[in-house]
Amino acid sequence: MGEAMTGLKRSHMCCDVSEVLIGSEVTVMGWVQRRRDLGQLIFIALRDRTGLVQAVVDGNNSAPELFKKAESVRSEYVLAIRGKVAPRTEGNVNKNMKTGAIEIIADELRILSESETTPFQVEDEITVKDDLRLKYRYIDLRRPCQLKNMILRHKTAQVIRNFLSDEGFLEIETPVLGKSTPEGARDYLVPSRVHPGSFYGLPQSPQLYKQLLMVSGMDRYYQIAKCFRDEDLRADRQPEFTQVDMELSFVDVDDIIDVNERLIKKVFKEILDVDVPIPMQRMKYKDAMERYGSDKPDVRFGMELHNITDIVRGTEFVVFKNAIEAGGSVRAINANGCGHYPRKQIDSLVEFVKTYKAKGLAWIVVNDDGSLKSQIAKFFTPEKLQEIVDALEGKPGDLILICADADRIVFDSLGALRCEIARRQELTRPDDFRFLWVTEFPMFEWDDEENRYVAEHHPFTCPMDEDLPLLDTDPSKVRAKAYDMVLNGFELGGGSIRIHRRDIQQKIFSLLGFSDEDAQERFGFLLDAFKYGVPPHGGLAFGFDRIIMLMTGSSSIRDVIAFPKVKDASCPLTDAPGTVDDKQLDELGIAIVKTEENEETNE
């Protein structure tokens, strides 16, 4: 049973109680971190979101009822304590606590709420399985590390809002219930009761609405928007996520990059006291792929890719020969200092790249005496092996790793491998922030399964002016006015200059396989708006959760979202998604049909 707060008002947060208040009466409220009983002295460490303060109940100088109540207190009880602030004796000062120089001599203690024994301790220095933490997320969030993440998230949002407001942006909310216009991933669908058989789509982004806001003359828009994607999860993705979304009129690529560089500089300085140098490095998509095997390269370390196709061309080694004849390439990285790896560890790298569809790896070890060891040595002359090593500036103690396949597989495999080796070798620090822009993405990517082009970003991205003629002759070579901000191997945000001409937009839809009727059905409202005067415009969206993850050094965005989902898009806390009763389904005109495999599908 809990007591009422009647007559008590909190005067201070726990960590606001300091030496300047010595002799003053304060009232604090919070959770019991721990209780120590030393006979006639009971010490209670009380915690709120600011931290801890110690309260003391002295059995020799307090009412028996107060002392008895203090004896009954247990961890995670919620208390209100009123008393006078006093200095701690010299031997009892705790320099590890912000309030370690003082304590509160309790005159009144109320137990506002009792607590059962928690499934895990509210401490940072504990190991708890993720499923248990997330099932009891409200307890997990009490831990200082989780509180710190939530507070940093709040402060970052405030800095962003203030900066964009000062830059002339208007914060405008766009609908959550919209039309399903898939942008690459599956939409979450919401059935309409009023319009049987029709569905809303939850937004993957506010893309179309923010373009309409530019047509409306809003000039500069932003919102911190909730977005949804029904896709497989990974460490840095969630089915519902938050974007810092913006759109600007009468701008070019440089304008958008400039405002976002200054935004990031402001955020990192005010929140982390980190100076981000601007202008940031820019790298064309083609160069990023050639050098790092990724369109979101981690540039905190080297280990760049080298194209050795010409060096090994004409070889009888069938793996290299077949890759080259099929139009692929042979590329390599130099894992500096990894020549000491035992064969078992090298084999683990071979297995690693197989997850990226590579058939394997060739390797060359540069021994300490400069001699070479390789499983492909019998296929090459010593001079040819040395030529490969020299091309990668190999030196004693290095390990050369070679992949031969289609370009996409080689890039994916070596791009991931360099990051895996960097992880194993501890070549990076989470507090080393290396930003860059990747620009000039391909406009289209060919989808073999669907036998058509798909948009690399989305179908509203504007082609480079000089590439417009290629839309009619060779769409695969068209570059987009698109740009991604990358930080330490993660895409922080991406955007583009948009198409503002109706004729070009219709041509893009046609290249993507949309008939005029399909385009009108899906995007007719946008095409209609383009009849009435459209300013040149562009924008960008940052993954807010991902930014916070990187700023806090967390390994997953789950740690920076208050109530996240897990890999199967379920919520361990609420057991969502859940079933609904037949009456609700009947109102929506939906029936659940069990297939022969006993799987449930909506019909």
Language-model features: locations:
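Class II aminoacyl-tRNA synthetase catalytic cores and aaRS-like
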Residues: 1-603
